[in-house]
Amino acid sequence: MIPGEVITPETDIELNVGRETLKVVVANLGDRPIQVGSHFHFYEANDALQFDREAVKGFRLNIAAGTAIRFEPGQSREVELVALAGKREVYGFAGRVMGRLDENVD
Protein backbone atom coordinates (compact mmCIF):
# COMPACT_ATOMS: atom_id res chain seq x y z
CA MET A 1 0.00 0.00 0.00
CA ILE A 2 1.17 3.50 -0.85
CA PRO A 3 0.77 6.14 1.92
CA GLY A 4 -2.52 7.97 1.31
CA GLU A 5 -3.77 5.32 -1.10
CA VAL A 6 -7.46 4.47 -0.93
CA ILE A 7 -8.42 0.94 -1.90
CA THR A 8 -12.07 0.64 -2.86
CA PRO A 9 -14.15 -2.44 -3.63
CA GLU A 10 -14.66 -3.38 -7.26
CA THR A 11 -18.45 -3.12 -6.85
CA ASP A 12 -20.55 0.00 -6.41
CA ILE A 13 -20.88 1.33 -2.86
CA GLU A 14 -24.54 1.33 -1.83
CA LEU A 15 -25.79 4.03 0.51
CA ASN A 16 -28.38 3.54 3.25
CA VAL A 17 -29.11 -0.11 2.43
CA GLY A 18 -32.16 -1.43 4.28
CA ARG A 19 -33.23 1.98 5.61
CA GLU A 20 -36.77 3.31 5.21
CA THR A 21 -37.11 5.71 2.28
CA LEU A 22 -39.91 7.78 0.79
CA LYS A 23 -40.36 9.95 -2.26
CA VAL A 24 -41.89 13.40 -2.03
CA VAL A 25 -42.60 16.17 -4.54
CA VAL A 26 -41.07 19.49 -3.47
CA ALA A 27 -41.86 22.89 -5.00
CA ASN A 28 -39.88 26.10 -4.45
CA LEU A 29 -42.52 28.82 -4.13
CA GLY A 30 -39.92 31.45 -3.33
CA ASP A 31 -38.09 33.90 -5.58
CA ARG A 32 -34.56 32.64 -4.77
CA PRO A 33 -32.79 29.30 -5.17
CA ILE A 34 -32.81 27.08 -2.08
CA GLN A 35 -30.15 24.47 -1.44
CA VAL A 36 -30.65 21.64 1.07
CA GLY A 37 -27.68 19.59 2.28
CA SER A 38 -27.43 15.83 2.59
CA HIS A 39 -27.87 15.63 6.36
CA PHE A 40 -30.34 18.47 6.92
CA HIS A 41 -33.56 17.41 8.68
CA PHE A 42 -35.86 17.91 5.69
CA TYR A 43 -38.90 18.66 7.89
CA GLU A 44 -37.11 21.88 8.92
CA ALA A 45 -36.08 23.01 5.43
CA ASN A 46 -36.83 26.55 4.18
CA ASP A 47 -40.52 27.49 4.46
CA ALA A 48 -40.56 28.52 0.78
CA LEU A 49 -40.30 24.81 -0.06
CA GLN A 50 -43.77 23.30 -0.30
CA PHE A 51 -44.29 19.62 0.57
CA ASP A 52 -46.04 17.47 3.21
CA ARG A 53 -43.88 18.38 6.21
CA GLU A 54 -45.47 15.96 8.67
CA ALA A 55 -44.81 13.05 6.29
CA VAL A 56 -41.07 13.82 6.17
CA LYS A 57 -40.45 14.36 9.89
CA GLY A 58 -37.36 12.32 10.77
CA PHE A 59 -36.04 12.12 7.19
CA ARG A 60 -33.15 13.63 5.22
CA LEU A 61 -32.19 13.60 1.54
CA ASN A 62 -31.02 10.19 0.32
CA ILE A 63 -27.87 11.54 -1.36
CA ALA A 64 -24.16 11.16 -0.69
CA ALA A 65 -22.73 12.87 2.40
CA GLY A 66 -21.48 16.38 1.75
CA THR A 67 -23.67 16.94 -1.30
CA ALA A 68 -26.85 19.00 -1.69
CA ILE A 69 -29.88 19.49 -3.92
CA ARG A 70 -30.73 22.94 -5.26
CA PHE A 71 -34.35 23.95 -5.84
CA GLU A 72 -34.68 26.82 -8.32
CA PRO A 73 -37.54 29.36 -7.95
CA GLY A 74 -40.74 27.92 -9.39
CA GLN A 75 -39.19 24.47 -9.74
CA SER A 76 -41.01 21.33 -8.63
CA ARG A 77 -39.19 18.00 -8.40
CA GLU A 78 -39.44 14.61 -6.76
CA VAL A 79 -36.73 13.71 -4.25
CA GLU A 80 -36.01 10.58 -2.26
CA LEU A 81 -35.59 10.86 1.49
CA VAL A 82 -34.12 8.37 3.98
CA ALA A 83 -35.00 7.96 7.66
CA LEU A 84 -32.58 9.38 10.20
CA ALA A 85 -30.80 6.66 12.19
CA GLY A 86 -28.94 6.49 15.48
CA LYS A 87 -30.61 8.01 18.54
CA ARG A 88 -33.21 9.74 16.31
CA GLU A 89 -32.80 13.00 18.21
CA VAL A 90 -32.82 16.29 16.32
CA TYR A 91 -31.37 19.53 17.70
CA GLY A 92 -30.69 22.81 15.95
CA PHE A 93 -31.58 23.30 12.29
CA ALA A 94 -34.70 25.53 12.46
CA GLY A 95 -35.42 24.59 16.09
CA ARG A 96 -38.74 22.89 15.32
CA VAL A 97 -38.01 19.56 17.03
CA MET A 98 -35.25 19.98 19.64
CA GLY A 99 -35.44 16.44 20.98
CA ARG A 100 -36.51 12.89 20.24
CA LEU A 101 -38.36 12.04 17.06
CA ASP A 102 -39.83 8.86 18.52
CA GLU A 103 -41.82 9.48 21.69
CA ASN A 104 -41.94 5.82 22.71
CA VAL A 105 -38.13 5.45 23.00
CA ASP A 106 -36.58 5.45 26.49
From Swiss-Prot:
Keyword tRNA processing: no
Domain of life, source organism: Bacteria
Pathway(s) served: Nitrogen metabolism; urea degradation; CO(2) and NH(3) from urea (urease route): step 1/1
CDD domains referenced in this protein's UniProt entry, alphabetically: Urease_beta
GO molecular function: urease activity
HAMAP family: Urease_beta
NCBIfam families: PRK13203.1, urease_beta
The protein's name in its UniProt record: Urease subunit beta
Protein source organism: Acinetobacter baumannii (strain ATCC 17978 / DSM 105126 / CIP 53.77 / LMG 1025 / NCDC KC755 / 5377)
